[in-house]
Amino acid sequence: ADDCKKHRKDALMCANYILNTPCELNENSDLMWIYCARYVLLWDEKSDEILISFPKSSKEWMICPEIMSVFLAACTKTAIEDKIIHVYSKEMHIKAVTSCVKYYIKHKKIMDMLCKPNMKKLVKKHRRGKLEKYLSNQYEKEYGNGKPQTENFFIPE
């Protein structure tokens, strides 16, 4: 856990790389993306500062390891930059899922070739300017009154 504190900048750098780089199908780009995704996953797992919960509603679209990596990167970035420590908050949920939607829209062709995540509903809400409200309501419905989560990972079935 202490090592994780020393390597926050590395985790943030990897998270930013994931969020800003398409997961391309060529060897060089893909390997760097995969290394960054692996680093973020391990940092999240070992750090005692970050807590991530996978919402049950994410089952439809988080079937794709690349989207899951984007979700983890967005949670990591939010936790570090906004200092959201030890909880999975509504703010983190909204930012992480919104990042996944924006990433999917920006890299739709590549994402559909890799795994075809079912993000139609979320993309439609985003385009209509209703995504944040939808995610806020979804969080409250799943987690009750919008309270931050303090339990560890929920892995989609």
Model-derived features: positions:
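Non-catalytic accessory regions used for complex assembly or targeting
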Residues: A1-K6, Y134-E157
